[in-house]
Amino acid sequence: GISEVLPGHYLVCRENSVKDICYWKLKSHPHEDSFEKTVEKTAWLVEDSVKKQMLSDIPISTFLSGGVDSSLVTAICASELKKQGKILNTFSFDFAENQKYFKANSFQPSQDRPWVEKMVEYCGTNHRYLECDNRDLIKNLFRAVDARDLPCMADVESSMLYFCSKVVGYNTVSYTHLTLPTT
């Protein structure tokens, strides 16, 4: 079978052997900060990380699902751009006729749109809703697998590829997830 090289590992391949070597491993340490210090430090790390990623010589945008992560990134970016007299472009994505056929479940207990609308109003962003239908998903399915180079969740990967291809027509730099620095 085919196995994936794990994060933090590399392979040494010789004529008759393959050796898996771990070069990095996350180390856990006891958390000793107070609740207040933890909140302060986390807020600083998140805000600092987003601000550093905003450095661009072209307009930026964010993907806004209405969830905690994208809402946090959007709020920070919108606030920083307002200081420069600029308005943040935001994008959200939905499936055609989702409002008609949506069924709540444990993975997605509610539709995204009401939360997106609250964040757009709160942050004062220039927002665009983008949609795709089943044909769009099917057209992008094999491209999504090729891009990922791994098997994937068909609708998620295919829709994200489609979504990104549409957003690039408006903005070429868009943020959605955080990469926090280590201390």
Predicted segments with their positions:
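N-terminal segments that mediate ammonia production and transfer
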Residues: G1-D33
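ATP-dependent adenylate-handling active sites, centered on carboxylate activation for C-N bond formation
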Residues: E15, K25-L180
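Extended, polar beta-sheet/loop recognition surfaces of beta-rich domains
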Residues: T183
